[in-house]
């Protein structure tokens, strides 16, 4: 069993945490995040240190406490440093262009794909074949990146499609006659 729940979270300067029962709100330079946790978990704040503990000793309560601790830690990291996911477009004529809260994608379809961005997420396109998704909420950043990748996942024969920058595409050999 992992012991993640037992390690406390030290808050960096400039981060404000408010706890109201099972609701935890974190404010920082990159924004504010809030989350409601399971009733089997108690969260406490003392002298700039957040501790998470299960209310009883059941396996489920410890699992929920570990999850809550990881989520709170990611909230603190998100409002201080932020999270980012890099995507690459591989293929002839595949392009991306950010226009405010909309990402315009040309992915070889007969029509352009316009992806609406949720609140708290920004997208940059350093080049026409690169996309950088940034935000304070790790889950939302990952979800947006997965949705963008889902429009044209990489195929195994030529490697064409939208892929994560650090993703390795397992290539297949073409059928031999």
From Swiss-Prot:
Instruction: Please give the superkingdom of this protein's source.
Output: Bacteria
Q: Which InterPro entries match?
A: Ribosomal_uL6-like, Ribosomal_uL6-like_a/b-dom_sf, Ribosomal_uL6_a/b-dom, Ribosomal_uL6_bac-type, Ribosomal_uL6_CS
Per the record, GO CC terms?
Answer: cytosolic large ribosomal subunit
The alphabetized UniProt keywords are: Ribonucleoprotein, Ribosomal protein, RNA-binding, rRNA-binding
Pfam families the UniProt entry points to: Ribosomal_L6
The Gene Ontology biological process terms listed for this entry are: cytoplasmic translation
Give any GO molecular function from the UniProt entry: rRNA binding
Q: Does the keyword Ribonucleoprotein apply?
A: yes
Q: Does the keyword Ribonucleoprotein apply?
A: yes
Cross-referenced HAMAP family: Ribosomal_uL6_B
Q: How does it assemble?
A: Part of the 50S ribosomal subunit.
The UniProt entry's sequence similarity note says: Belongs to the universal ribosomal protein uL6 family.
Q: What does this protein do?
A: This protein binds to the 23S rRNA, and is important in its secondary structure. It is located near the subunit interface in the base of the L7/L12 stalk, and near the tRNA binding site of the peptidyltransferase center.
Protein name, entry field:
Large ribosomal subunit protein uL6
- The protein's organism comes out as Hydrogenovibrio crunogenus (strain DSM 25203 / XCL-2)
């Amino acid at each position: 069993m992992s012991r993640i729940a037992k390690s406390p979270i030290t808050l960096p300067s400039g981060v404000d945490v408010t706890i109201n029962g099972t609701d935890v709100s974190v404010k920082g330079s990159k924004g504010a995040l809030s989350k409601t946790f399971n009733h089997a978990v108690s969260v406490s704040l003392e002298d700039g240190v957040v501790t998470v503990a299960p209310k009883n000793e059941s396996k489920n309560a410890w699992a929920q406490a570990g999850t809550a601790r990881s989520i709170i830690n990611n909230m603190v990291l998100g409002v201080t440093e932020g999270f980012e996911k890099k995507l690459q477009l591989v293929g002839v004529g595949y392009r991306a262009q950010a226009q405010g809260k909309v990402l315009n994608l040309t992915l070889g379809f007969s029509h352009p794909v316009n992806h609406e961005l949720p609140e708290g997420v920004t997208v940059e396109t350093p080049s026409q074949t690169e996309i950088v998704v940034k935000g304070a909420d790790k889950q939302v950043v990952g979800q947006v990146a997965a949705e963008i990748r889902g429009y044209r996942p990489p195929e195994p024969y030529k490697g064409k499609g939208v892929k994560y920058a650090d993703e390795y595409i397992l290539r297949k050999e073409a059928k031999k006659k």
